[in-house]
């Protein structure tokens, strides 16, 4: 099947579903006729603002790995298909961080840059998340976030220098079409909310000097809507506490802080049968939730998130849509058996529109 035909089939499926949901079925025929002419003439077509907005929302709703999909229809969609210069991209990314952060009352937001043209990226964002900590490794010593080591090395090759602390903010880094090298820009500190991690009952917890940033803005996935590929489309919700407390700060291949947590909460870390890891995880996660709430930054605990996902399941059934999900990602990393998600199965079929992983340009 040739490319135009594949695109036309994707467009037909999307427009039919999108317009049906928007209550505009009577407009489908005319819109598809326009799209067909456009594809025949140019090999592609351009979404209306309404199609783009609803398509991005549908993509969130179809994201099998996301437990937070109840709020799919509240997504704030920023259309920046008009950008042409590095400065415009930089300013749009700064604006995304500011509007999504919303002084701590986090707003689910996506900024959509120009789509690929004939497979060529107009804007290529290198960051995994717009806000993330650098990682350094030398002579067996690890500083910062090991998950960021390869991107940090790429930034250093381009002349960026971090302070080599555990929490250096990586710069924004992206490449424009036609440029051989990407450009980087430091993040203004005033844009980034960071939360020092303290414990509601254990004062010594603050001695660990842990912190995390407020907003997780995924920036290396591709949004696909009706056969059009928006490879640069950073998006965010808010954190579920376990993402920070049971993964980012706890994983052995990340910040690996469980032994230090055990120490400050006063338990021995000698025997697996003492369940010290479990105890340390609970206290660390309690501290994360407490700290974000104390600073007025949106966050959700995994039990509430699972209850919200139950409501999403019910909503989808009422709407007559087939629910899809990836069980291995939907179960929270601590106490999964205490959620309904653990005790049922999900169909992991991929439905479009959706978000897709892309190869990293720096690896």
From Swiss-Prot:
It catalyses: 3 reduced [flavodoxin] + 2 L-arginine + 4 O2 = 3 oxidized [flavodoxin] + 2 L-citrulline + 2 nitric oxide + 4 H2O + 5 H(+). Disulfide bonds: none annotated. One of its GO terms (molecular function) is nitric-oxide synthase activity. Pfam families: NO_synthase. Tetrahydrobiopterin (H4B). Can also use tetrahydrofolate (THF) in place of tetrahydrobiopterin (H4B) but binds THF with much lower affinity than H4B. It comes from the Bacteria. Its EC number is 1.14.14.47. Its cofactor is heme; (6R)-L-erythro-5,6,7,8-tetrahydrobiopterin. One of its GO terms (biological process) is nitric oxide biosynthetic process. Keywords: Heme, Iron, Metal-binding, Oxidoreductase. It is an enzyme of class 1 (oxidoreductase). Heme binds at residue 66. Belongs to the NOS family. Bacterial NOS oxygenase subfamily. Homodimer. Catalyzes the production of nitric oxide. This protein is similar to the oxygenase domain of eukaryotic nitric oxide synthases but lacks the reductase domain which, in eukaryotes, is responsible for transfer of electrons to the ferric heme during nitric oxide synthesis. This is Nitric oxide synthase oxygenase. It comes from Bacillus subtilis (strain 168). The gene is nos.
